Each structure stands twice: as structure tokens, then as C-alpha cells.
Design a protein with these regions (language model features):
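An amphipathic, aromatic/His-enriched active-site/gating alpha helix that lines ligand/cofactor pockets
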Residues: 34-47, 65-99
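A general boundary/transition motif marking the beginning of the first structured unit of a protein
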Residues: 4, 28, 73-76
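Serine/threonine-rich low-complexity intrinsically disordered regions
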Residues: 6, 21-24, 43, 78
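Glycine-rich beta-strand-turn "strand-cap" elements at beta-sheet edges
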Residues: 1-12, 19, 50-58, 86-112
Length: 112
């Protein structure tokens, strides 16, 4: 499933901002990419993930969509997920995960 940003789409969005040393940014992106490909894509409720690296090298953002808050919460309790997060936290200095709901969307193709 592709990432769809819409106020009509059910589900929740995880925006997780990681702080990382510039020389470890690529390592963090690779670890998040690997965890997504190996674990998250097969979990119930997972919809999509997009990993962004800041141009200054000190942040990585994981923008992920889940079918529901319950599905997201269930994922956090899994041993395989916790193992990947443990690895990720050996690379990242800090992280700030938050769940969001889409409230407004604007784009060139769909101007009012």
C-alpha cells in the first residue's frame, strides 16, 4: 500500500524524530529500513513507512501509517520489534515518537 495522506483515510500516523550524530545518520536510516522490510511490513495494521534524513545530518524521521492506534500499540509489545528498537537505539542519541491524525491536506492537483 502506498502512503496516502487524507483527512478521510482511517488510521493513525506515527511521526518519530530521531536525533543522531551526523556520521551515524546513514547507519540509522539503514537500520530503520531493514527493520521495516524484515518485520513491520508483515504486521497486522501496518500500512506504510517513509524514512527521511535531514540535510544537516542530525535527524532522521520515520513517517509511518497504521490502521489503528490499537494495531500500533500491539506492535510495540512484540519481541521482534523490541529487538529492532534496541538496535536502533544503539545508533540514535534520542527519539520522539508521537501518533497523529491528519487534519488538513493541500496539494497542487487538488486545489479548491
Amino acid at each position: 500500500m502506498y502512503t496516502t495522506i487524507s483527512t478521510d483515510a482511517p488510521g493513525v500516523t506515527l511521526i518519530n524524530v530521531f536525533t543522531v550524530a551526523p556520521d551515524r545518520q546513514d547507519d540509522l536510516v539503514a537500520a530503520l529500513d531493514r527493520a521495516t522490510a524484515e518485520v513491520f511490513v508483515d504486521l497486522p495494521g501496518f500500512r506504510s513507512a517513509n524514512i527521511h534524513a535531514s540535510l544537516d545530518g542530525v535527524r532522521v524521521v520515520n513517517y509511518a501509517q497504521w490502521a489503528s492506534e490499537d494495531g500500533f500499540t500491539a506492535m510495540l509489545k512484540r519481541d521482534d520489534v523490541q529487538a529492532h528498537m534496541k538496535e536502533i537505539m544503539t545508533i540514535a542519541d534520542a527519539y520522539e515518537p508521537r501518533l497523529f491524525a491528519v487534519r488538513a491536506v493541500h496539494n497542487v492537483e487538488h486545489r479548491p
